[in-house]
Each structure stands twice: as structure tokens, then as C-alpha cells.
Amino acid sequence: MIDLKQIKIACTGYILISIVFYITGFLCIAAPELMQTHSRIIAGVILITYGIIKIIGYFSKDLYCLAFQYDFACGIFLIVLGIVALCIGARFKDSSLLAALGILILLDSLLSIQTALDSKKFGLSSWKYILILSMSAGTFGVLVILKSTITFAGCALLAEGGMRHYIVQHTAKSPDYQYQDDNELSK
């Protein structure tokens, strides 16, 4: 039996970062002034944390290798982007930070679309929902890139959080997982 500690840490990390996305997204919509005032610090800390969680996820051994399959390179990218967000000064426009967020969410959603297609190959019925959530997050990512508003950023963060949360809940299985119908698991 394989030690499940690392996969549990990765799954817990993804669920926690999803909750952070939910809270941050809600605050972007409900209190945009507060979020704009502290956006660089908040973004930097979240990006670095998310990058670390992605790298931990990459090295965990889940049954399907779906939830964390692209996370090593993405994790390093997020950490670097987080450091840049923390180091930039006031000369960097908030619209540029929002555009970077939109690009990041678009990239993550495109990789998740590929995860949905791979899930279909494994016969997981959850692939349809992964695809829908990924397309929704990607759409909001594009809107953030084009419009650069804090409200769209909030919606994009909510969609990203929902997508990540669902993917980790429905694709991250331990290697000693006994196969059950995916429909039974979602009850």
C-alpha cells in the first residue's frame, strides 16, 4: 500500500486554495476598492502559495495522473509570477496585473480542458463537468484580459476556484483506489 500522505496534502492544498479563490473572487466583486489597494501583495502571496501546492501535487502519485499532470511547470511559473508581483512597484499598472491574472486563468482552463478529454478516455463521467467548468473559467479569463475590470477578475477567480475544486475532488484518486462507477462516487 502506498503512503497517501502526499496525495492528501496536495488535495487539501487544492481545496484550501480553491477556498482562497472563492473568498478573493467574492471580495473583488463586493469590495473592489479594498482589493485594488492591496492587489499586488495579495496576488503575490496567492500565486506563490498556489505554485507550491501545484508542485506538491505534481509529485503525488494519483491513480489517473489527471488532477496534477501539468503542475510542475505551472507551479514554477506561478512562484516566479508571485515574486514578480511582490517586487513590482507602483509604476506597474493594475490593468497589467489583471491581464496577467486573465492569462493565467485562461492557461489553467485550457490545461483543464485537456484533463477533461483525458478523463473521458478513462471513462470518468465527470469529464463533462470538468469541460464545462474549464470553459467557464477560460471565458472569464478572456474577459479579464479584454476588459481588465476587478469585477470580471472576481468572477474569473470564482470560476477558477470551482474548476480546481471539482477537478481535485473527482480525478485525484490514490493508486490503491478500488474502482467504482464514477456516478456512485458523486452521490
Give short role names for the model-derived ranges.
Residues 81-89, 136-150:
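Hydrophobic alpha-helical transmembrane segments in multi-pass integral membrane proteins
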